[in-house]
């Protein structure tokens, strides 16, 4: 974590990036669940062979493109190596509302990839993080931060659940909940221009010209 990182976020970084190195594969799915695919492109390196075999990152992604890539790589027989000795300074100082926005996008990304995330549990890791973070704050004698932890965790959970059900929400509400507004604009444009050949006429389809 960065020097200005708060105690709650500091523990979250340590929780996600532990001190022990490991190698993960699909064989770990039952044991690790969602953590099997945990992979952050903030501090990652890819071999060209693997990147090209998987087909690179998806062209349009709201969030989680790194975990989607990791899951697809594992399905092709690759493994993920986590090197605990590698160092990258990275952390966030999000407020509760920003946590809601971020986790809304997380929920959307999982809903858009049921072939990857439907079979694994995410909420179990979330509950474990809150429980261990509480113990950490007690040990640090910073009990006054526990209410903040609960508020932030609640916002994460609400955002995540809303993201998972985003197809049932009106677009106006989605735009208030998302952190990545550009994604929705790009997706709408992609859907609106689907089937149009830009090299035909003035960018209209053959059916429209008829």
Label every model-predicted segment:
Residues 11-26:
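Short, flexible helix-coil linker/hinge segments at the edges of structured domains or between repeats
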Residues 132, 151, 159-210:
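Juxtamembrane C-terminal module of membrane proteins
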Residues 1-11:
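Conserved donor NDP-sugar-binding/catalytic core segment of glycosyltransferases
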Residues 44-46, 50-55, 60-87:
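A short, conserved alpha-helix in the catalytic core of glycosyltransferases
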Residues 80, 86-159:
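Active-site-adjacent helix/loop segment of glycosyltransferases
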Residues 6, 21-24, 33-34, 52, ...:
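Residue-level signal for pocket-adjacent positions within structured domains
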Residues 1-2, 21-23, 42-43, 86:
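Short, flexible active-site-adjacent loop segments at beta-strand->alpha-helix junctions, enriched
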């Amino acid at each position: 974590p960065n020097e200005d990182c708060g105690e709650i976020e500091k523990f979250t970084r340590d929780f996600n990036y532990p001190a022990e190195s490991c190698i993960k594969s699909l064989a770990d799915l039952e044991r690790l669940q969602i953590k099997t695919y945990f992979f952050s492109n903030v501090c990652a390196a890819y071999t060209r062979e693997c990147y090209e075999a998987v087909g690179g990152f998806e062209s349009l992604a709201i969030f989680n493109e790194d975990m989607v890539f990791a899951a697809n790589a594992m399905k092709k027989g690759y493994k993920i190596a986590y090197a605990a000795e590698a160092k990258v300074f990275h952390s966030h100082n999000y407020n509760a509302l920003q946590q809601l926005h971020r986790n809304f996008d997380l929920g959307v990304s999982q809903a858009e990839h049921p072939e990857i995330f439907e079979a694994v549990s995410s909420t179990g890791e979330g509950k474990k993080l809150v429980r261990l973070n509480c113990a950490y704050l007690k040990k640090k004698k910073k009990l006054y931060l526990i209410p903040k932890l609960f508020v932030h965790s609640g916002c994460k959970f609400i955002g995540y659940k809303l993201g998972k059900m985003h197809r049932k929400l009106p677009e106006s509400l989605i735009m208030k909940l998302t952190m990545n507004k550009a994604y929705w604009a790009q997706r709408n444009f992609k859907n609106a221009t689907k089937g149009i050949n830009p090299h035909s006429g003035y960018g209209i389809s053959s059916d429209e010209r008829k």
